[in-house]
Swiss-Prot record:
Record text on subunit structure and interactions: Homodimer.
Function per UniProt: Involved in the gluconeogenesis. Catalyzes stereospecifically the conversion of dihydroxyacetone phosphate (DHAP) to D-glyceraldehyde-3-phosphate (G3P).
Source organism (scientific name): Acidithiobacillus ferrooxidans (strain ATCC 23270 / DSM 14882 / CIP 104768 / NCIMB 8455)
GO molecular function: triose-phosphate isomerase activity
Protein EC: 5.3.1.1
Family to which the UniProt record says this protein belongs: Belongs to the triosephosphate isomerase family.
Assigned GO CC terms: cytosol
Protein name: Triosephosphate isomerase
Amino acid sequence: MRPTMVAGNWKMNGLSGDAVHLTQAILHAGLEPMRPEVVIFPPFTLLHAVSQEAKSSALRWGGQNLFWEASGAYTGEISGAMLRDMGCRYVLIGHSERRQIFAESDAQIVQKIKAALLSGLIPVVCVGETEAERAQGLTDAVLRRQLEAVLPLLNLEASQPNLIIAYEPVWAIGTGLSASPEQAQAVHVFIRELAAAYSAQLARRLLLLYGGSVKGNNAAALFDQADIDGALVGGASLQAGEFIQICRAAESAGRGG
Ligand SMILES: O=C(CO)COP(=O)(O)O
């Protein structure tokens, strides 16, 4: 399998001018449409600006989070319908920063995934172990717990998976210390095996992104791995040149070059 998605998670960064600049840089980079699919996840406040720039292109965008209720007295929250209204195709759910800083539980993440699916969004569900968990040999156990909540939501009636999984080891996020291609590949194989318990066909087609200090200079080696289908990029997605380099690495991997 070959990388099919490069996604940029801008986190809580950027003002309108930055959104226009970054989006235009990606649009003008001459990337091959959909090889890979390029997706950006700006803050909610920049979704409109991004959608205006990218609406007639192959570039896609999504929200970084959502709340599970459709509407109502939930001050400060954003629903799936609101994201759809901004033209979003995707939504990040369960990012480790949400799990750690905002104490999101596996049960809440399940509610969010259900709400996203009901709204017609494709959830990009983030999983991953902390440094302490890896040191204690708990990586598989943590991923199993996180994914046992998520994988039952796979639509077994469909021919294509209704969600995407991003493996983001917490120790690799924002540290400059990416997982090695072999480490990431081993975990991706494990995740695919867990998914195969629900459906072998969907497991084969499940998009597994790697995230954690992906840069222009390490992306190609990650994409060379058979089960790394793309990347979820944080810091480097805020620098147009770096992000475009990662997209090009995915293009080349897609050509077998
Ligand atoms: O959290 C991430 C993407 O969601 C990864 O962040 P970095 O690429 O900055 O390590």
